[in-house]
C-alpha cells in the first residue's frame, strides 16, 4: 500500500461504526467492507450477474439488488449455499478494498472489516489491527436496542464470530467502548495521534 493501513474490527454491537465515523471526521480515509458489499449487491452491482447465474432470479429484489431475506433463507436452509455466496463476494470485496486503499490520500487509512481475524485475506495489507471492544452483555444490550432481535438471536450471531478473547489476543491496539460516545471519540483521537506519530514516521 502507498500509505499504512489500520484494520478496524470488533464484535457485533461493539461500536466499530462509531469509531470509523470518528476517524473519518479526523480526515482519515475510511474504507468499509460492509459498504463495499452493499454496493456490489445493489442495483446494477458488479456481483449481481454472477449471483443470478449461481442462485437464479429468485434472490433478486424488484430493483435489481440482492434480496437479502431470500438469500438468508437459502443460506439457512442449506449452509453450503453460504460458501457459494462467499466465493463470489469475498474476492470481489477484497479486490475493491485494495483498489480503494491504493487510491487513498492521507497519512494512513482505516479498513473496516467486521470479520477481520476470521480470514487471513486482509492481514498482508495491514500495519496494525485495532479492535473496538466491550463486554458481551453490553454487545447484546446495544444490538437489541437498535434492532428487533432477541437476546438469544444476538448471542447466536456472536457465537458465529471469533470469541472476544481471541480478538483481543490478536489485536495490536484496543479501544474499550464500554462507556459512552464521548469516551469512544477521545480514545479514537488518542489512537489517531499515536498512528500519526508512529505509522507515518515509520514510512518516512
From Swiss-Prot:
Metabolic or biological pathway: Cofactor biosynthesis; coenzyme A biosynthesis; CoA from (R)-pantothenate: step 5/5
Root EC class: transferase
GO biological process terms on file: coenzyme A biosynthetic process
InterPro entries, per database record: Depp_CoAkinase, P-loop_NTPase
Entry keyword Transferase: yes
Name of one Pfam family that matches: CoaE
EC number(s) stated in the UniProt entry for this protein: 2.7.1.24
Domain annotation DPCK: ranges: 5-204
Binding site for ATP: 13-18
Keywords: ATP-binding, Coenzyme A biosynthesis, Cytoplasm, Kinase, Nucleotide-binding, Transferase
Annotated Gene Ontology cellular component terms: cytoplasm
Highest rank taxon of the organism: Bacteria
Catalytic activity: 3'-dephospho-CoA + ATP = ADP + CoA + H(+)
A GO term for molecular function: dephospho-CoA kinase activity
Gene3D superfamilies: P-loop containing nucleotide triphosphate hydrolases (3.40.50.300)
PROSITE patterns: DPCK
Annotated compartments: Cytoplasm
Oxidoreductase found in the keyword field: no
Predominant location category: cytoplasm
Similarity comment: family membership: Belongs to the CoaE family.
Protein role: Catalyzes the phosphorylation of the 3'-hydroxyl group of dephosphocoenzyme A to form coenzyme A.
The name this protein goes by in its record: Dephospho-CoA kinase
Organism from which the protein derives: Chromobacterium violaceum (strain ATCC 12472 / DSM 30191 / JCM 1249 / CCUG 213 / NBRC 12614 / NCIMB 9131 / NCTC 9757 / MK)
